[in-house]
Amino acid sequence: MNKILFYFFFFLTLILSATVYLFGGPMMLFFINYKTDLLKVDDVYNHEIYSNQSAAIPKIIHQTWKTNEIPEKWVGAQKSCIDLHPDYEYVLWTDESMREFIATDYPWFLTQYDSYPYNIERADVVRYFILYKYGGIYLDLDVGCNRTLDPLLHYPAWVRRTSPSGISNNVMGFAKGHPFLLQVVRNLPRFAFNYHFPYLTVMYSTGPLFLSIIWSAWRKLPDAEAWHHIWVMVPELYEKSHHAFFEIYEGSSWHDSDAGFVFYMLHHWAIFTFLGFLTFFIVVYFIFGYALKPAARVSRTGRRVFSSPFSKTSPSRWKIFHRFTSSNEKYDQTRSDSLPFMSDYDLESQTQSHSP
């Protein structure tokens, strides 16, 4: 029986360690307090606050598609944004122009850009580079406009909250050269993994979950958060409200069947956790229960098979971001100019033969 318990706790530790290693970052998103991050209706429509201030975000709307001919179902959404913003520059980036942009301005990333298995990953990453290079507002093609976006231009960085937790990358506004986006593009090569399911691969490597992980780490930087706050738009400003800036049309098509299963698991995580432990115990019992004889007690040192995933030396990619950060506020303040997100990394990276 002692040996059965040993194997049980051994495999339990293995599973828990692997779970924390792979999903520790996303799990922590459920515990984020958004209170200080929210961009509310009263904030945006209080014209007295910003009547004498210049816009932080340039008047540019960016969208991406394979070619210049977008699907008919999104023409109305595109037209609504163009018609409401005659004084804005509108840019539709195609697959060809996106790759040319990366090859010309960020050649150090071109190999990684070409290696992504899904086109949506390239569409994800290029929006980060575009907003960093030019600034402006990025909108997915299924996002239409209900009203002028001028009030949002006074906020140097804003995104929208997504469900069940974290932020989305389908609607974003950033000032040119925003340091948060610099951290985003620097971390892209470190999150480039294939999770064998299209939805998970996209979400973790380039999509909203990846962006949320970087944002979560960014919020913990005293200097970065104080100087370059990222505002999170409340749902009332996004859709289904008379205050909403946007209207969502028929959605994108890259979500495969695994997406629905992932969302179902997220909404019923407690049940799946219980069933997982129950199944694991039953399997271990039937594999070892009748075959093993009572064994001597396992020493405590023999049970430490894996190092803690919370260790500072852990290779977990959810913690890789912290090599650029410090938790000491005084230390950060004395070296703010030399922090990676304050350095001119673009010029530096183009002279290097390897990814950052």
From Swiss-Prot:
Disulfide bonds: none annotated. InterPro entries: Glycosyltransferase_domain (IPR051706), GlycoTrfase_DXD_sugar-bd_CS (IPR007577), Nucleotide-diphossugar_trans (IPR029044). Glycans are attached at N52, N146. It is found in: Endoplasmic reticulum membrane; Golgi apparatus, cis-Golgi network membrane; Golgi apparatus, trans-Golgi network membrane. The modification Phosphoserine is found at S307, S353, S355. The chain crosses the membrane at residues 4-24, 197-217, 269-289. Keywords: Endoplasmic reticulum, Glycoprotein, Glycosyltransferase, Golgi apparatus, Membrane, Phosphoprotein, Transferase, Transmembrane, Transmembrane helix. Its EC number is 2.4.-.-. It is a multi-pass membrane protein. It holds the Pfam family Gly_transf_sug. GO terms for cellular component: cis-Golgi network membrane; endoplasmic reticulum; endoplasmic reticulum membrane; Golgi apparatus; trans-Golgi network; trans-Golgi network membrane. One of its GO terms (molecular function) is mannosyltransferase activity. GO terms for biological process: mannosyl-inositol phosphorylceramide biosynthetic process. It comes from the Eukaryota. With imt1 and imt2, is required for the synthesis of mannosylinositol phosphoceramide (MIPC). Catalyzes the addition of mannosyl to inositol phosphoceramide (IPC). MIPC is essential for cell morphology, cell-surface distribution of ergosterol, localization for plasma-membrane transporters, and lipid-raft-mediated endocytosis of plasma membrane proteins to the vacuole. Belongs to the glycosyltransferase 32 family. This is Inositol phosphoceramide mannosyltransferase 3.
